[in-house]
Amino acid sequence: MNELSSYLRRTLCEAWRNGYGEEARRAAIVAPLLTLVGFAAAWFFPQLTDHVMGVLEQAIDSAGLSSTAETKDMAAAIFANNLTAAFSAILWGLVPFAYLAAFPLGFNFFLIGALGAYYVRSGSSLGVYLVGILPHGIFELPALVLFCAAGLYLCSRVTARVRGDKEVRILRTLSEVSTLFLYVILPLLAAAALMETYVTPRLLAMVL
């Protein structure tokens, strides 16, 4: 156990120094700003939210996240859906120059803000909306920031290598990102899925 802890600390600290820390800080700063932009956009252009809600409902149904699903199936579906999103965002980092992981970061936090405006305009309180997202969001939102930052970090390293930086070791970077995924992001997503399935609905039932 001590050896594992030492390995994790050493690997994650190295990734942080090599640029992951910068990407994570940047993502953490941009995320709340995008949420505010999403809220403002949906507040002043409500037709935008109506379209987004239609797309979101279709995505929920296709992912097996409908309210009619069994509880255990719901937890598994939420975890699988978030796991796929995280894995995809990180893999996109293998494409140099594009920084594709910025898209899920921007879209998801913009959507959180837009949905907040939608519920407030529909007559619900912002407090009820926060009760619906914060219990699992305290795990899921940091995971979202971390895995998008991992994709951006991987892209920056691949880009540097393509540009001729011989000091960048892609295999080492992949090892860093894999360690982060397995020992930090994965547990956060698992906790988020359990909270969203078993805790959030009960809290919502208390305030609705």
How would you label these PLM feature ranges?
Residues 43, 47, 93-117:
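Transmembrane alpha-helix/helix-exit interface in multi-pass inner-membrane proteins
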Residues 8-25, 89, 166-174:
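Cytosolic juxtamembrane amphipathic/interface segments immediately preceding
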Residues 18-53:
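N-terminal signal-anchor transmembrane alpha helix
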Residues 149-208:
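Terminal transmembrane helical module of multi-pass membrane proteins
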Residues 64-92:
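Interfacial helix-start motif at the membrane-water boundary
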Residues 134-151, 155-157:
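A structural-propensity feature for long, helix-poor, extended segments
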